[in-house]
A protein has these predicted regions:
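Hydrophobic alpha-helical segments typical of transmembrane helices
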Residues: 52, 56, 60, 85, ...
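N-terminal (or domain-start) structured segment
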Residues: 31-121, 160, 168, 184-212, ...
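C-terminal lobe and pocket-closing loops
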Residues: 217-285, 314-317
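Beta->alpha turn/N-cap motifs
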Residues: 101-106, 175, 196, 212-218, ...
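An extracytoplasmic/periplasmic, membrane-proximal ligand-sensing/linker region
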Residues: 2, 38-40, 270-331
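Short, low-complexity disordered leader/linker segments with a strong preference
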Residues: 1-38, 330-331
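Hinge/capping helix and adjacent helix->loop/strand transition within the periplasmic-binding protein
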Residues: 91-97, 111-198, 246-248, 259-292
């Protein structure tokens, strides 16, 4: 009887040791994922401090720190129109501790430049955070009151009307040329500046005729007083209910917004991704975060990872086709 009990006890102990060993020898990714995050998370912003990407990322990072109990640290890695920072994340570990926070410039850059990564495949979409329509501003005394009149004016003066951009291949150029193509082929001159601020200054001075920009860019500047004749969202901007959309004025399915979202490297740990998606959805729908976004002329935008992936791919294709059509895409 004693021998039988002793044998059973040895079997039980051996089994317990094996079970404990299995837990201890679990892969690092399994151990990390079970309690993600258990250390600080880096949020890479591929632009210099102070811009909308940086400002929104910092507010989001603070909210994530409060909800998940770990620091979310901002690292600014500017260069090549978001390529430097984006490429850094594309090559990062897939454990969920390196995240890219970026605007739709991820798509416009991929549409114009030859990037070291395939934007549609190199990243794991996590969640959208916010979006903002663009606004079409005119110089004073141009003599038109709405988009239809502007289109007619450009057609009557082929090659003589000019518009401003923040640089070759930026949002403003691509969306202006897309609109020109969709309304039947308008001939205009594109004037590229080093940033949107000098373009807006020249619009105020009357040196250029119009430009697409964001409310965040003109807030507190003289450009905010210029005529606003159209917004590019799917619906009218709540702050300017009397200004119709491009879609309303043309009948075209023309909707272009700047959006902000979070991505990881392709193949990122799915549990970490899903935790982030759920937390970001909660954060952006709080009244405090919504009020914060309003100060930037933006509004909350929630999505599933798959929806963000479709949004990115659609924009990459649209801007690639536009850049090729006007001959500015790098070979």
């Amino acid at each position: 009887m004693y021998k039988k009990c002793h044998a059973l006890r040895r079997i039980f102990v051996a089994g317990a040791v094996c079970a404990i060993s299995s837990i201890l020898l679990a892969s690092p990714s399994q151990a990390q994922t079970s309690k993600w995050p258990d250390k600080p998370v880096r949020i890479v912003v591929p632009f210099a401090p102070g811009g909308s990407n940086d400002v929104i990322a910092r507010r989001l990072a603070d909210s994530l720190r409060q909800s998940l109990g770990q620091p979310f640290l901002i690292e600014n890695k500017p260069g090549a129109g978001s390529v430097v920072g984006a490429n850094y994340v594309a090559q990062a570990a897939k454990d969920g501790y390196t995240i890219l926070f970026v605007s739709g410039s991820l798509a416009t850059t991929a549409g114009v430049q030859k990037t070291p990564y395939d934007a549609k495949l190199a990243f794991e979409p996590i969640a959208t955070v916010a979006e903002s329509p663009f606004v079409l501003l005119l110089r004073e005394n141009l003599g038109v009151k709405n988009l239809k009149e502007l289109i007619a004016y450009v057609k009557a003066n082929p090659g003589k009307v000019n518009y401003g951009t923040a640089g070759i291949g930026d949002n403003a150029q691509l969306m202006t040329e897309l609109l020109a193509k969709e309304v039947g082929g308008l001939k205009m001159q594109s004037i590229a500046y080093k940033g949107i601020s000098p373009a807006q200054l020249d619009l105020v001075a009357g040196r250029i005729d119009f430009l697409f920009t964001t409310m965040a860019s003109i807030k507190g500047t003289a450009a905010d007083a210029l005529p606003k004749i159209a917004f590019t969202g799917a619906t009218r901007d709540p702050g300017f209910p009397n200004v119709p959309t491009v879609k309303e004025q043309t009948g075209l399915d023309y909707v272009v917004t700047i959006w902000w979202g979070a991505f990881g490297p392709a193949g990122m740990d799915k549990k970490a991704r899903d935790i982030l998606n759920a937390e970001i959805k909660k954060i952006v729908q709080t009244p405090a975060f919504e009020t914060f976004l309003e100060t930037l002329g933006a509004r909350p935008m929630i999505s599933t990872p798959d929806q963000l992936g479709v949004l990115l791919a659609t924009d990459v294709d649209r801007w690639t086709a536009t850049a090729e059509a006007i001959g500015i895409r790098q070979k």
